[in-house]
UniProtKB/Swiss-Prot annotation:
This protein's name: Toxin Acra2
Known tissue expression: Expressed by the venom gland.
Annotated family: Belongs to the long (4 C-C) scorpion toxin superfamily. Sodium channel inhibitor family. Beta subfamily.
PTM comment, free text: Contains 4 disulfide bonds.
Gene3D superfamilies linked to this entry: Knottin, scorpion toxin-like (3.30.30.10)
InterPro entries in the record: LCN-type_CS_alpha_beta_dom, Scorpion_toxin-like_sf, Scorpion_toxinL/defensin
Function recorded in the entry: Excitatory insect toxins induce a spastic paralysis. They bind voltage-independently at site-4 of sodium channels (Nav) and shift the voltage of activation toward more negative potentials thereby affecting sodium channel activation and promoting spontaneous and repetitive firing. Is lethal to mice. Is about 1% of the total protein in the venom.
Record-annotated LCN-type CS-alpha/beta domain positions: 2-23
Keywords: Disulfide bond, Ion channel impairing toxin, Neurotoxin, Secreted, Toxin, Voltage-gated sodium channel impairing toxin
Length: 23
């Protein structure tokens, strides 16, 4: 998860998809 992003129920920001790298 990246601080400062709205996250989904998994704690990942939409901007992280599809690779989730930043989560």
């Amino acid at each position: 998860k990246k601080d400062g992003y709205i996250v989904d129920s998994n704690g990942c920001a939409p901007e992280c998809f599809p690779t989730n790298x930043g989560c």
